[in-house]
Amino acid sequence: MSEFLPFSRPAMGVEELAAVKEVLESGWLTTGPKNQALEQAFCQLTGNQHAIAVSSATAGMHITLMALEIGKGDEVITPSLTWVSTLNMISLLGATPVMVDVDRDTLMVTPEAIESAITPRTKAIIPVHYAGAPADIDAIRAIGERYGIAVIEDAAHAVGTYYKGRHIGAKGTAIFSFHAIKNITCAEGGLIVTDNENLARQLRMLKFHGLGVDAYDRQTWGRAPQAEVLTPGYKYNLTDINAAIALTQLAKLEHLNTRRREIAQQYQQALAALPFQPLSLPAWPHVHAWHLFIIRVDEQRCGISRDALMEALKERGIGTGLHFRAAHTQKYYRERFPTLSLPNTEWNSERICSLPLFPDMTTADADRVITALQQLAGQ
């Protein structure tokens, strides 16, 4: 059998090793100059005013919800077809996640679904830029402005995603992820961008014990050696080791995403003749970052179930992923919301399969996946 082809593999090289070596030799391992440089680079990438690096996108979501004073009695609108950390953070703060359905073919939450879910208790809306494509954020933001509700963009899949000519996160508040499978990675990490100066100040405190400054601030600006707690906070800062890797990856972003796009185009051309259904692209002008390439495997249409397809690909040495199992079908949320029905989400959650997609894949690797799909479709 050929070497196992994983669903994803980080694109690491000598540049990342050199960046880590530089940090180790500098003596400043935790939050410091590399964090500062990463934050500045994301302001340049997105065009937003403030950037706050954190230990994960989940951490970023947690402190953003906290800074917005979301808690018991509040509701937060979010799709169910998302990673469970968003729902978990809402729930841990005592608020209620209000899960809404998505478009059947783009898997994006729609402005109409969001607006129909608003109540007097709605405190925030969290749209997801899914799989590397953008949600219709202008329309969603307009709803937030009309009702006076905060919008927090889940941009975990959207480093390199553009909407109507502007990078995701160009205005408002958005949260990016640098997890190991993301378009750029530093193993674990995340970053928040915002145009709200007061929110940015609160996020910086909350990510570091509620202190007004961190150790690098004190060294750089000569502030008092003992910082003071201004509000209870967390230990969510990013180390400079991670930030240095993320910076190096960010410098390669155009190259990395171009390769993802080439593989996605190869898949799209082949799937035109197969029963497996890729996602539809959004109707609005955009640049897709191709974080994921997803097909829907309908047993009646394809002659094989999604789970059987994934197992058959595994037997052929090909890895796949599932993004995502709907949150409201998982034990805790199923028991908490037993009557919730989201038809489009449920239909897709039972059929979606993420194919291998990462920059170091070769054309031959993609051909191998396509050949396996052709065989499993009986062609």
Swiss-Prot record:
GO molecular function: pyridoxal phosphate binding; UDP-4-amino-4-deoxy-L-arabinose aminotransferase
InterPro entries per the UniProt record, alphabetical: ArnB_NH2Trfase, DegT/StrS_aminotransferase, PyrdxlP-dep_Trfase, PyrdxlP-dep_Trfase_major, PyrdxlP-dep_Trfase_small
Entry cofactors: pyridoxal 5'-phosphate
Swiss-Prot/TrEMBL catalytic activity: UDP-4-amino-4-deoxy-beta-L-arabinose + 2-oxoglutarate = UDP-beta-L-threo-pentopyranos-4-ulose + L-glutamate
GO CC, one annotated term: membrane
Subunit record text: Homodimer.
The protein's name in its UniProt record: UDP-4-amino-4-deoxy-L-arabinose--oxoglutarate aminotransferase
